[in-house]
Amino acid sequence: MSKKRKWDDDYVRYWFTCTTEVDGTQRPQCVLCNSVFSNADLRPSKLSDHFNRQHGGVAGHDLNSLKHMPAPSDQSETLKAFGVASHEDTLLQASYQFAYLCAKEKNPHTVAEKLVKPCALEIAQIVLGPDAQKKLQQVPLSDDVIHSRIDEMSQDILQQVLEDIKASPLKVGIQLAETTDMDDCSQLMAFVRYIKEREIVEEFLFCEPLQLSMKGIDVFNLFRDFFLKHKIALDVCGSVCTDGASSMLGENSEFVAYVKKEIPHIVVTHCLLNPHALVIKTLPTKLRDALFTVVRVINFIKGRAPNHRLFQAFFEEIGIEYSVLLFHTEMRWLSRGQILTHIFEMYEEINQFLHHKSSNLVDGFENKEFKIHLAYLADLFKHLNELSASMQRTGMNTVSAREKLSAFVRKFPFWQKRIEKRNFTNFPFLEEIIVSDNEGIFIAAEITLHLQQLSNFFHGYFSIGDLNEASKWILDPFLFNIDFVDDSYLMKNDLAELRASGQILMEFETMKLEDFWCAQFTAFPNLAKTALEILMPFATTYLCELGFSSLLHFKTKSRSCFNLSDDIRVAISKKVPRFSDIIEQKLQLQQKSL
């Protein structure tokens, strides 16, 4: 990291004064045109160059007076005394607004001074004239400035979220997942769900690197230290949902053990999306071998540059639409469904290409039994994709997610009965290639066995139907049979009173379930609290998955040393920075530093 330069009073001879950022960084600001430069420009050669080139090296005011004059951003009246109009507030606002858009679009910080500002100056000169261009020139948009602005906006957004967490009438829900970036650095990302103004809000919390290792204790320490750093008690967390895909975040991991030890009341849930990857564990040997053959074929094509180029040229030559395959080692199961569909639809062309390359994969790939297994797998994972897609949204709670899983599993017996009768309607790819009764017999037996194993797996892993009968009033307090509630249940009176209100019935019919119960906090606090404790926990790590997609935009080869947290927060947070407060605080801080 480069050493920060410091202001010297002798620099006033070039008609510059000093501005100080929130972090203490000093930057030179021209009194004559209000331009703010980076800390790296805080040296005589740079300041003299600007003074001579932009202002002709002549200024008609007393330097001794200038030494005691604050920066233009601090006292506009002082500048007016020197005949210089101050636009610092609007310049700062423009600078912050651009930095905000830069982060939202996930652009490099240098895009402002290298591309946007030069283009804007040219446009201003052509369309509006030199006066407009001169005003636009004063907007500070250097790399350092944009970086500083984003940091400040990130801290303001974080402060808003922390204030909301402290004010939430109910313990918050946490969503936690881990991924590895392009530098093989493990990144831990967290989102939070809390109640604010009669609705459940989901917000980005943090994205931090795991510096030493990826053990459960390291994850827990990072998680705990975030709350300690911001002076929030850890027991504000009522639930935590993990991706469940790795040992450190799995059901029996160290992380879960440490969390439960520190917060005994916490509800731990596991993502109902990612564990679908475990479906592969239920595949019989022949089906698993077929899947691994697909993996090897794609890696043969995509994993070797010459093969990949030849593959693209081959498909262009024969005029086939699909010419790009995803890199397919141990893929996420969601991609697996899409890939298997593409492989099945391109089967003949891929087979020709393997023959063309004299690959030893040909024998397994063109086997008739393999193609039948491929068709079944493509159909099966397409169904799984549709299930996953139905749960990939914000606001998904564990009750709704488990209902979708339960509905999916209930289809299995119908599929099994149809398959036993050689009816493959639910598996269109398979139906397309089954041409003889003998082929239908052997695959029907395999499928019915696998669907039974899959059904057992879903019931065991996802605990389908967790909501007991006595708690189903949460889903519909008006149609629910109140006799199911025990007479000693203190909230039975509240339920009876709530059901008698026509206005509340109208609210129930027009509002989302979570928002409805949030709205009842004032009139029926016990009912609302009980209902929301069940609806609050995250059901998936979908938000983290979206966050990881943003991480890929930020962490590129040209920005591999980039500190992610602040930019990601500004980019994906729903909150908008309080620009007026940030600018006012900045001006006050600069004034005090003089």
UniProtKB/Swiss-Prot annotation:
SUPFAM superfamilies: Ribonuclease H-like
InterPro entries assigned: RNaseH-like_sf (IPR012337)
Organism per entry: Homo sapiens (Human)
Lineage, top ranks: Eukaryota, Metazoa, Chordata, Craniata, Vertebrata
Name of this chain's protein: Protein FAM200C
Note: May be derived from an ancient transposon that has lost its ability to translocate. Exhibits a close evolutionary relationship with ZBED5, but does not contain any zinc finger.
GO cellular component, one term: nucleoplasm
